[in-house]
Amino acid sequence: MVDRRSFGSITPPLQLDMEQLLSEAQHRWLRPTEICEILQNYHKFHIASESPTRPASGSLFLFDRKVLRYFRKDGHNWRKKKDGKTIREAHEKLKVGSIDVLHCYYAHGEANENFQRRCYWMLEQHLMHIVFVHYLEVKGNRTSIGMKENNSNSVNGTASVNIDSTASPTSTLSSLCEDADTGDSQQASSVLRPSPEPQTGNRYGWTPAPGMRNVSQVHGNRVRESDSQRLVDVRALDTVGNSLTRFHDQPYCNNLLTQMQPSNTDSMLVEENSEKGGRLKAEHIRNPLQTQFNWQDDTDLALFEQSAQDNFETFSSLLGSENLQPFGISYQAPPSNMDSEYMPVMKILRRSEDSLKKVDSFSKWAIKELGEMEDLQMQSSRGDIAWTTVECETAAAGISLSPSLSEDQRFTIVDFWPKSAKTDAEVEVMVIGTFLLSPQEVTKYNWSCMFGEVEVPAEILVDGVLCCHAPPHTAGHVPFYVTCSNRFACSEVREFDFLSGSTQKINATDVYGTYTNEASLQLRFEKMLAHRDFVHEHHIFEDVGDKRRQISKIMLLKEEKEYLLPGTYQRDSTKQEPKGQLFRELFEEELYIWLIHKVTEEGKGPNILDEDGQGILHFVAALGYDWAIKPVLAAGVNINFRDANGWSALHWAAFSGREETVAVLVSLGADAGALTDPSPELPLGKTAADLAYANGHRGISGFLAESSLTSYLEKLTVDSKENSPANSCGEKAVQTVSERTAAPMTYGDVPEKLSLKDSLTAVRNATQAADRLHQVFRMQSFQRKQLCDIGDDEKIDISDQLAVSFAASKTKNPGQGDVSLSCAATHIQKKYRGWKKRKEFLLIRQRIVKIQAHVRGHQVRKQYRTVIWSVGLLEKIILRWRRKGNGLRGFKRNAVAKTVEPEPPVSAICPRIPQEDEYDYLKEGRKQTEERLQKALTRVKSMVQYPEARDQYRRLLTVVEGFRENEASSSASINNKEEEAVNCEEDDFIDIESLLNDDTLMMSISP
């Protein structure tokens, strides 16, 4: 039975010897438990106020990300990505036990690949700002993890080590296994400290036999009486016995199995049978409190590992040659217990290749073979727990239920969310995985999920995505798995955590007040979230790839909090009361669930409007939930999505004065110059800057006005760098607000002075953008007039790029190419400037004209008779015979032509209707655009006059800068993960080939 305390404390309080830890950090990486202990007690250490300069190997630093943002700038040259600019910094999560507790970002040196840097910080929200950085030069590629002996503290010539009594076995061994996966050239001996004399007892009253000293000390476990008991089908163990006996018959393996074989007949025996082969026989197992194991040989652990390593391949081949069939374990109540000495072999046989997500190394298998007990369950890095009994407090008489394994696996769990809930909160749980059945068979079953001993129905949202509601449950960890409504597990078993405490129902009026605009928006938003559509069965297999990708993006944003702005969550939390903060957390869970549901639905999905004409993105912007913008965009909502009145999310954020939300929207590409729908009161519409200015948010108004000017110019000059020599070199004259940075603060600077400096820079930037836009408009108008005067209406196609390039290069001096062209033209003109050359040219031209006239006259005279015959024929047939007319008989060739009367003069009574020209519409639109540009420039200039507006503008620049840095780091992490998936050989963090070679036993056993 799994000990509850092994899950209760993620990071047990370790008594670290800092001097020894610092000395060991010179040649090995620290383990997650040690790092967690340091980060949780960071106030006891010195936090560096500035980044180091080229730190040496073995250096350890603590930084505060809120204080020192650029702690990674250490002067070293790290390995770059393909672009040659961004540092290739990969990311992983480290576990303590079965729970992710640490972020780990690691980088490799460019010149020296063995020199590495690892940055760690906690996943807990209140400790995320403390960063632990470790520099180390790894000696060699891989070394096995072994026990480090200390001869100075040995007794009778042997080293005796034990684990701190306060450390939970699960945490200790999990960290040991993590080192085997993620460490480079390190030894698992930090939490193991030398002891002058061996431990002979423990707090549970169980005393190990003398022969068990080494095993118990290595694992640090304590066997106690189990509250649950299982009955194992003995016939299923015959196959295992056949393989073990064949292995036992080998001469070089006799000694190894003899060392492992206990002599007590009350435990599991290994019998040899020459006819039927060896089999494992389950006898009566006594209580662990009354049973002691008498080992025939007190073998040292190192000797056993060496012997097992030498004979591992033979053992694997013998087991792999058997035709093993899957078998299951079912729960029964009789008080019978199974000794755990051979439980690891049974677990290996129960796991099929489909459910085996990650193979463990040989060191894990050897440790489990030596002495895994029932209250110590090793867990894989994916967080799935073993098939074992999990204690439940709901049992009245101390009897617990164990998950029952079905005959075959029908579903593979990749991830699920959320992984915890309050005891009385029936939250929705999303399970992402893969069905191992055909679509017809998937719809045939009634799928359910088990939370401990409670089975709840599940709904299929899309192929591979299930949704269920967690039932009310007592606090604690329970097994979680998928069933076919028969209480038998058809997937891997995971762990769900029920947290103590009750869910508080918070009303929107308690947070935002009564009869306020925010309370009304919140209530309408909650009403929208409550709206769900039923997913039909014939739709769950449509567009599976796109839907799963969107769901994966949403869940990734939910798990990764790195997209949050630095300090944004803390600032909002300080502004709100505790009830408001709790309401925000509850609302966040509902929002993510709603987005996943809408992604799987048919129709508009999340692009829907409520009864009053607002959508989800508009509510998010109006309420200031900037943390929800990226998940909403990941669900497929456009950032410029309009409501019924033509308002975008940026309009709502500016109208409500949400600084962080405005900065996030502009950084993500929202159109700052978008207009609302025209109305009788506002025939020209309003921009977001106009709405912010009307509500007194002058800083936001100036920020958006500058953004509209610079972004409009950026759209016109999107490709001008390639064709314009003016912009091909040098710094950009006009920067967008997403590219700008706030003025850095130095010693002696006053905040008012810095905000004034930023505001003046904004005025200069906006003035240059407006001036260039006016030049572009004037140039386009002038070129059109020239073409209209020439009459070449087909060539009235002036590109914006040409006009912008000309406007940008007007102030520049002509280059060397213009001088050379002028010289060439002058040389050509000089050749024909003399009277002699000109006379020859005129004579030649006159002769050519005469020749052309003779040729044309000859052609006309040659065709004259044919033309006369044709005209006569047509005159007789059509004009005379067909139309019964006179034909050409009365035609007079020398008759005077009839004079055309002149048109009457244009008067006010009868004006002439002007000819329609589509350019008139463009002129009117351009006139309105110029008025808006002038108004935007006025908004930016007026911002300088108010200190509050200048401070608000500086805060917006700071948020935009922080958002840009977080986006760069997160995109680099995602790209690194993609590159590592394609190029596994470049990843020095985990050696996949060595793990596969070590786990031949596990891979060879198939059901």
From Swiss-Prot:
It comes from the Eukaryota. One of its GO terms (molecular function) is DNA binding. It is found in: Nucleus. Residues 821-850, 844-873 form the IQ domain. Residues 233-398 are annotated as: Transcription activation. The keyword Iron-sulfur does not apply. Signal peptide: none annotated. Expressed in roots, stems, leaves, pollen and siliques. Residues 165-176 have a biased composition (Low complexity). Residues 869-891 are annotated as: Calmodulin-binding. PROSITE patterns: ANK_REP_REGION, ANK_REPEAT, CG_1, IQ. Induction: Induced by UVB, wounding, ethylene and methyl jasmonate. Induced by salt stress and heat shock. Induced by aluminum. GO terms for cellular component: nucleus. Transcription activator that binds calmodulin in a calcium-dependent manner in vitro. Binds to the DNA consensus sequence 5'-[ACG]CGCG[GTC]-3'. Regulates transcriptional activity in response to calcium signals. Involved in freezing tolerance. Involved in freezing tolerance in association with CAMTA2 and CAMTA3. Contributes together with CAMTA2 and CAMTA3 to the positive regulation of the cold-induced expression of DREB1A/CBF3, DREB1B/CBF1 and DREB1C/CBF2. Involved in drought stress responses by regulating several drought-responsive genes. The two IQ domains are probably not interacting with calcium/calmodulin. Belongs to the CAMTA family. This is Calmodulin-binding transcription activator 1. The lineage of its organism: Eukaryota, Viridiplantae, Streptophyta, Embryophyta, Tracheophyta.
